[in-house]
């Protein structure tokens, strides 16, 4: 379980707007699930890998 999310890691779920989970594929999270992913990225919920804090993730490049 992600301490910042009320669901199992890697499982589609609904999270609050304050969701900070990175591994959880939050379907309702309005923020990017990756710090390097732009807000609103449609592919971020499919899971992405961030190479660095300032780099784009591989699914939103």
UniProtKB/Swiss-Prot annotation:
The molecular function terms in GO held by this entry are: zinc ion binding
Q: Does the keyword Acetylation apply?
A: yes
The residues listed in the UniProt record as binding a divalent metal cation 3, with positions renumbered to this chain, are 15, 19, 24, 29
Where does this protein hold a divalent metal cation 1? 5, 7, 21, 24
List N-acetylmethionine occurrences by residue.
1
Which InterPro entries does the record associate with it? Metalthion_dom_sf, Metalthion_dom_sf_vert, Metalthion_vert, Metalthion_vert_metal_BS
Under the cellular component aspect of Gene Ontology, which terms does the record hold?
A: cytoplasm; nucleus
Which parts of the sequence are annotated with region: Alpha? 30-61
Matching entries from PANTHER family are given as: METALLOTHIONEIN, METALLOTHIONEIN-1G
Write out the similarity annotation: Belongs to the metallothionein superfamily. Type 1 family.
**Protein name, per record:** Metallothionein-1
Organism (species):
Chlorocebus aethiops
Phylogenetic lineage: Eukaryota, Metazoa, Chordata, Craniata, Vertebrata
